[in-house]
Amino acid sequence: LNWELNSPEDFEKLQKDFAAVVLCVGGRKAKGLPGIQVDNKQIYHAKDFLTEVTKDMLNGTELANLKDKDVVIIGGGDTGVDCAAIALAQGARTVHQLEMQECDATANSARDNLCNIVIGDYTISYGTMMKRLLRDEEGKLKAVEVAQVEWRSERSGALPDAMEVLGSEKLLRAQVLILALGFSGPEDEIFEACGVKRSPAGMLADGGE
């Protein structure tokens, strides 16, 4: 417990101390967006934001305060909803959660009549993509440009692609952006420390020793 595997030497020690080592790793590498740099001041990965808030609550220290701020959350899953709930609880001025998929195409669409429940909910926008960030003269985040998308196939039998709806662009005020996009796999350090082979997609590959 309370021990990190950071180097090949750490792994060699485990192998000497135990008859077998079972590598059980989850996907902790948070997905990002091209060209967007997370700084944990104005732009967060959801897991980092939620971790910071939880530590503040447990330690009795000041919360990552979103009071009177405009918050945009990219990602319409449960983690994004958790971030939205915290933002509202902390007194954010506005909260907008964006999801590229249409509601009826999401994993939770069949649960508790979700899509009918969220009709008219101004805090979450389905079929919506983020186009770019806008910053003020000091380089601070001030707004996010978004647009609606339609999912359609260009040819018969092809999977649908997200097509931007021309003329649907609008600006959302934002001093805080939270990326709740899921995970792309385990963090690189665990592979490097253990010498385990990876697949081209970055997952565990057969033949690792």
Identify the residue ranges that each predicted region occupies:
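Rossmann-like dinucleotide-binding cores of NAD(P)H-dependent redox enzymes
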Residues: 1, 84-132
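Feature captures the FAD/FMN-dependent oxidoreductase FAD-binding
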Residues: 1-36, 132-145, 150-153, 176-178, ...
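Short acidic loop-to-helix transition motifs that present clustered carboxylates
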Residues: 4-9, 50-52, 103
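Short amphipathic alpha-helical segments
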Residues: 33-37, 84-86, 189-193
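FAD-site-proximal beta/loop scaffold in flavoenzymes
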Residues: 41-67, 154-209
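Beta1/beta-strand and adjacent pyrophosphate-binding region of the FAD-binding site
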Residues: 67-77
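N-terminal Rossmann-fold NAD(P) dinucleotide-binding loop
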Residues: 80-81
